[in-house]
Amino acid sequence: MNLFATILIIMTTLSLVLALVSFWLPQMNSDTEKLSPYECGFDPLGSARLPFSLRFFLVAVLFPLFDLEIALLLPLPWGDQLNNPMETLFWAMTVLILLTLGLAYEWAQGGLEWAE
């Protein structure tokens, strides 16, 4: 038998054995408290249409912006190997200034204030 057929037979046998063992083993400690879902302190059996705070959404929108900032600035140390490293520095500073101005605007508008 070739290697592929041997590996296929071993994988099939092992899969069947593991599936049969999982059906034969009893459920240990099946308690209603352990079988209920855990939802981080929220009632899992309540309504799914609870109002969502807009503050969470605003913070969630700000996070990817600054995450992308880090991703854009990571290759910056390799920019000095280019023909014109000052152009790379110019565009990196432009991105930083735009994001800083956006953060200052959001802060001035009160978007980062949690309690009103």
Swiss-Prot record:
GO MF term list: NADH dehydrogenase (ubiquinone) activity
Gene Ontology BP annotations: mitochondrial electron transport, NADH to ubiquinone
GO cellular component: mitochondrial inner membrane; respiratory chain complex I
Subunit-level organization: Core subunit of respiratory chain NADH dehydrogenase (Complex I) which is composed of 45 different subunits.
Localization terms from the record: Mitochondrion inner membrane
Family: Belongs to the complex I subunit 3 family.
Membrane topology recorded in Swiss-Prot or TrEMBL: Multi-pass membrane protein
The protein's role, per its UniProt record: Core subunit of the mitochondrial membrane respiratory chain NADH dehydrogenase (Complex I) which catalyzes electron transfer from NADH through the respiratory chain, using ubiquinone as an electron acceptor. Essential for the catalytic activity of complex I.
Entries under InterPro entries matching the protein: NADH_UbQ/plastoQ_OxRdtase_su3, NDAH_ubi_oxred_su3_sf
Keywords recorded for this protein, A-Z: Electron transport, Membrane, Mitochondrion, Mitochondrion inner membrane, NAD, Respiratory chain, Translocase, Transmembrane, Transmembrane helix, Transport, Ubiquinone
Protein name, as recorded: NADH-ubiquinone oxidoreductase chain 3
Superkingdom assignment: Eukaryota
Transmembrane segments: 3-23, 56-76, 88-108
Catalytically driven reaction(s): a ubiquinone + NADH + 5 H(+)(in) = a ubiquinol + NAD(+) + 4 H(+)(out)
Sections of the chain in a coiled coil: none
Enzyme Commission number(s) from the entry: 7.1.1.2
